[in-house]
Amino acid sequence: MSIYSTEELRALGLADFGEDVRISKKASIYNPSRISIGNHVRIDDFCVLSAGEGGIEFGDYIHIAVYCSLIGAGKIKFGDFSGLSSRVSIYSSNDDYSGVHLTNPTIPDQFTGVTHADVLLGKHVIIGAGAVVLPGVCLEDGVVIGSLSLVSKNCAAFGIYSGAPARRIGERKRDLLELEKQLRQQSMPSSGGKQ
């Protein structure tokens, strides 16, 4: 994977970024001044990051796999240790499909009924391949979303959700919280700030 160097990341004009940020040069980045990236973040080939007014914020230790899309005018925020499997789509904007308005971005705003709402992913959230997350959703800490799920409602902490629409099907173990503590203790002396 061909990734941006630190100098190239600076030249992109990101709002800020931390250490060990690996973004594929094959990713598409729109409105980089509205994108903030923490430490230890990897964004793979063919991802689309289209930051609207709310921006996109990545915490630390985050992976965004190939072909993911983060799109919309609302904020999209990732907590530490969260990640997306391939082909996940997160939308913070949505057209009105009722027929009352015209749809698509080529139409002037006064003829559309686009709505915008923030999407928030807590710490340790993982979303399976091909899942779709709609505007206004909050995935609390530790949530797992199964592959090909459609998430239109908030998901409670450490729940495992699957389906279209996504429903809670189980409880996730919390052992990873202790592992997080151990990792943070190990990396404290060398942890750096944002660029």
Language model segments and positions:
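Extended, small-residue-rich solenoid/repeat segments and analogous flexible loops
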Residues: 1-36, 40, 187-189, 193-195
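Short-chain dehydrogenase/reductase
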Residues: 22, 83, 126, 132, ...
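Conserved beta-strand-loop-alpha-helix hinge in the C-terminal portion
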Residues: 157-159, 165-181
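Beta-rich strand-turn-strand
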Residues: 119-120, 130-143, 149-152
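Flexible, glycine/small-residue-enriched loop-and-beta-strand segment within the central core
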Residues: 4-5, 27-37, 42-133, 164, ...
